[in-house]
Every structure is written in structure tokens, then in C-alpha cells.
């Protein structure tokens, strides 16, 4: 279905930011592009070779492994429908970068230089050390655009656009405007923003501070201070400062975390134990699998989670197709849906949509030409357009709230006007 680095993806989806990389050499097109002996890397007369890079394992236990399942589900359907302009997708699966920059770059090099892929889709990690390599080797790459590397490089695309703007670009206002709706307006409301102590977290704090202020909030606390490589065992130093940051030394109306799930569980548990009754929000904890443990369910109860795609609770034709594709790829089982599946699925979908438009003679050049004029509407991430998506997000999203062990839509999926970033 045609249709945009992860400490920031905790920051800009809402964004857990990350970095990635690339590699390999692109052959010329001296042979006829559609022939079986075509010199286009990863393209034969009947197949297009694609690989992925995903943080399947991490030191904290957090995993994005279902990103691979989501991508496979979409590629499987494309193949079942006859492929792309007569070519099947030969999806090699995702390389595990372990959320490690060196492994991310190594994965990119392997896929390009050893496996000879035409494209990398999905790429989902909080690190994208392979980005320069992939772009330099002209490898079309699609993933979750929560890292700066998804904003500007010619051959790299975010499945829902660029979520990490550069000066002169724009900011997605889905999160602040959505929370303003939940709180009955932003006027007179205060918000605390917290992120990990790394470049991605610092950039996330910068962007969200501007965004929440533009929406009318008072930003009472905005710090990227949590150790990014080791989760705190004691959150009191952070909670005490947050709970005294509001007007008059009181608690803020909302606490927004731009961190990954294990960190959010620790922070939110500590805030609740301290008696905090305000709104809690993050961009990563939309995952029914998290609810299997009572402690996790309690920590996340009441939390508003930012989504940049239609909620699974939606009953649109596109969502019904997504669920059917995931079920089939999972062997006919009704597996719990999560945002990583959507990341993989829509990364694959954007790649397929552009490749379809490129036509039978698929080369890097024809793919890029197709991308330069690509647009579609009504997808699971809203209306898509390139190269616009390499400079700004598609601007759409929703908020869901965990209530008594179930997710419910708090703010329906819609698109918001962006604001200038500077």
C-alpha cells in the first residue's frame, strides 16, 4: 500500500534518536537494465535484493526486532501480488546492530559490499553510523526518520519524513498540539522535558522546547541529563528536580520523556511513587507486549503515547490490510501489534511505492528520479511527498492512552501545520 538517530526517536517520533551508515559500489548501466546480467547492484531480471538494519538486541533489553517482521509482511504481499514491475523482492532480513555505532556501520558495509543489496529498508536504530557510507554508495535507504541522517542526504528517506529538522526547516507539532488538546489548552500549562545525555537527546530537548513553547506551554524543565549508556537504579535526583520545576516551585502539568521504554518505566514509576498526578507522555510505549508484566502495566498506566501513524484501534481499509499482512507473515497467528512492526511495514511500503514508480528499468538514478516527484495520500502515516520528506515530517499523528491495561485513542490521527525551526 503506497503512501517517513533514537534517543531522539524519543525526540522527534517522538522520538528515539539514532544514527546509521552505508556502503558498497554501484555499477554502471552498460547492460540493459532489465536483463538478467544487469550491472545494477542488487537488481536482476526477476528480483530486487533488499536488506535491513535493526536494533534486534540491546544492552538494556530493549528490542526493535518486530521491525523486521513488519518489513517482511509488506514485502511478502508485494511478491504475492506479482512483485514490482515484474520483479520479486528478495528480502534478506535485518542485520542486528545491537544499537552500537560500529556494528551499524559494519552492517551497512556487509549489506552493500558482501550481500550486494540494491536498497536498505528498514533502518531502525538509535544510531546511524552507516548513513554517510550508504549515501555515498548511492544506496536507497528507508527507515524511521528520528535521526539527523534522515534529513538531507540524497538517498536516505524517513518513512514518515524528516523528524529531526535543520535550521531553516520545520518542526512537527503533533506532540505539543496533541497534549494541549488533552489538557484543555496549553495556556497556563507547564511541561517538563527530559532526555538521555547524548547528542540525540540534547537535540531532542532543543526541538521540543521550541515546539512546546510555540504551542503555548511554559517549559519549566528541559534537560538531557539521564545517562544514555546505563539506566539509573535511583531516579530520585531527576524526579526531585522535575517536581519542583513548575510554577511556584510545584509540579509541572505534564512530564514528557524522550527516552526508550526501560527508561520510561523507571522514570514514570519513580514519579508516581513521589505522588505525581499530572500527565505523563512518551513516544515509544505503544506495545501490547509491554502489558504482560504487572509492574510494567502499572508504570505505564495513564501514559499518553505519541504515534506518527494511525492507531491500531483505527478501522480504516489501510489498517485492516496491515493487520492481515502481519498475521500472514506471523504464520497465521494473531500476534500483538506494536510500533516497530509499523516502522518496518511503512519503510518497506515507501520503498516499494517509489520503486514501482521508477518503472521496469530500475537503477539508482531511475529510483531517485521517481522519488523526486513522488506523492500519495491516505496512507497509514498520512499524505506522503518527496523530496519534501527529506526536509520535514509529513506532520501527522495521534495520541493513545493506556487505561486499565488497554490502549485507547486520546487524540485521533490528524495532520498539523508545521512551524519554522531555528
Language-model region placement:
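Extracellular/periplasmic periplasmic-binding protein-like sensory domains
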Residues: 161-165, 270-345, 414-418
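Bacterial signal peptide processing site
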Residues: 22-25
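Extracellular/periplasmic ligand-binding modules, especially the Venus flytrap/periplasmic-binding
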Residues: 197-200, 205-207, 261-266, 311-373
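Extracytoplasmic "Venus flytrap"
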Residues: 33-72, 94-101, 196-203, 336-342
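C-terminal motif of bacterial Sec signal peptides marking the signal peptidase cleavage site
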Residues: 17-20
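Beta-alpha junction/loop-to-helix N-cap segments that form part of ligand/metal-binding clefts
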Residues: 36, 62-69, 81-153, 226-235, ...
